[in-house]
Amino acid sequence: MSHDLPEKTREIFGKKPYLSLYFQNVPTEPLEFRLEAAKNPKEVFVSRNGRALASSVAPLTQAKRQTDSVQIQSTDLVAILGLGNPHLIREVNAKLEPGQILLLVDKEKDLIFPLWEEWLEPVMEIPGRHLFLGESSLPLLWNYLESLPVERVSGIRILRNAASVSLEEVFYAEADIRLRKILSSKMSDLLTKFEFERIWVRNSLVNTANFLSPPNPKTRIESLKEKFAGVPSLLVSAGPNLRRQCEWIRTIRDKVFVMSCDTSLKVLLKYGIIPDGIMTLDAQTHSVFHFLGEDTKRIPLFADLVSSPPILRNLQFRSVVHSITAKYLVDASGELKREATAGSKSAESLLGPIGDVQSGGSVATTAFDLLRGLGCRPCFLVGQDLAYSGREIHSTGTHHNEKWLTLLTRKTSLEKINEAVVRKRDTRYVPSVTGAEVLTDYVLDLYRHWFEESAKSLDFPIYNVNTQGAKIENTENIGPEEATRILETFPDHGYFWQEFPAWKPEIIQEDLVGSPANFKKDLLKTIDSIKSDFSVPSRQEESYETLLSLFREKLGPWEDLRYLIRKTEVYILRHKDKLDEIRKRQLFISAILKEFTGLRRKLLAGEN
């Protein structure tokens, strides 16, 4: 194909720049791929060095049979693996809605030259259609999927061109697995958002409005970034192995900055170990049980902005250090994209930069990235079993363990309670640090993979100090004795951070963009206005689209409030053909009144 590309092709490249990469090295030798005529008139197939990659008799019939055997919904993401049958591309494309996602994947880059003009170019003109050729394009495919909004996606349909797949079975099998895994993860994230997004927004707005409120002085993690450069950190989690390591922690206390997950706090305090910080992430109030009955007045609480407001309002800490959970993705255009927790935009409009922390879904993964941001290196993991070591859920001494002690009877032991919990989980065996195998579950295994992937990208070592938990790849799995030898090469830290504002709250000086009092006042005014507007009986006569437009207009600068009813919006969008206009209105208006009443109540909680 000539470098002098037609205007139509250049227009497509303007919208999908990555496609131009396939034309940078036009082969000078005869192509091993050719478009050949089939026995049936007006039908073609691709051949590779004379080998047909589709039916050489009736490729169109083959494609129609394949597409007819798959029921494709308008909310499905569709992928074709192997492009040896051009008719399959055209038949699938014809079944899809404009904007519906179609991914065309093949191991060979040179396929683009015989297929582009007649078969691929018309498809690539349509938004949502994408082409990934060659192994080097796979990172782009994974990045595209990771950054893809899945609110309108209900599932994935993968069609395989058998002749193409048979040439590179490993490549296509791995692509198939990864496609399903990423989409499954995205759907899981979406369900999590649907479940908790309303709570995240509510908590973020309430915590922002209460930023200067007593009893706890508050600051931002941004002010502590890289202040601990070169200081070893000890991240303490509440795995079953923790109780065996507490005596060791006391011996190396002066060498490390100790960050405790909220779950492990009670265990450390029982051994007389006062951590330098506590990490909490849970947006639900039941996490208060990790702190009840403990003296935390000397310890700063590192709290994600979505953390439960009653904990920050009713318990006493040295200070509260806020952060925001955000992840960074490379989208299909190659640009870095920041995806922060719902509610963060409004918070940053008042507080300024708060500080981003990436999370793998657990308190420990969040604390790990937070320690990296502080500049701590290396990092020692303790109690990070990520497994049911000894068939236990947590170390003894945690809140869960204390609660179970009240349930003990002659017939009910701790072992029986632990066993009942384990048997409800989706369990599997994974390699242990002992060289044997240890029982874990699906969620704990996800966290393990997160640590393994994160450790790959770091320029300092991670040590997993554990004697019975799961083996974490890309880290050094060691015992306490070896960890002590490593730490002996570091000087005592002298607790220099005690002079930082988070540990010396009397010197905290926060330079805010605006006033929290005005923030709360304006927010309450917007809430009352929207509630009043949608309580009018005449709204029940208007169309859903009119109500949606009115709602967005009434939000003004408070775009984050839309997340309160996003679950309802997406539900209506997914079932737009099944719900009548009356039901759509009822769902939408009731969601607005319910969520905005709840937010108003939370904002006013604790006021005298």
Model regions and ranges:
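Class I S-adenosylmethionine
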Residues: 1-77, 85-91, 190, 194-200, ...
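Acidic, Ser/Thr-rich peripheral helices and adjacent loops at domain boundaries
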Residues: 121-129, 279-284, 292-298, 321-322, ...
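Conserved S-adenosyl-L-methionine
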Residues: 94-101, 253-254, 272-275
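Gly/Ser/Thr-rich loops at beta-strand to alpha-helix junctions
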Residues: 81-89, 108-111, 136-139, 162-165, ...
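Long, compositionally biased charged/polar accessory segments in the mid-to-C-terminal portions
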Residues: 446, 455-608
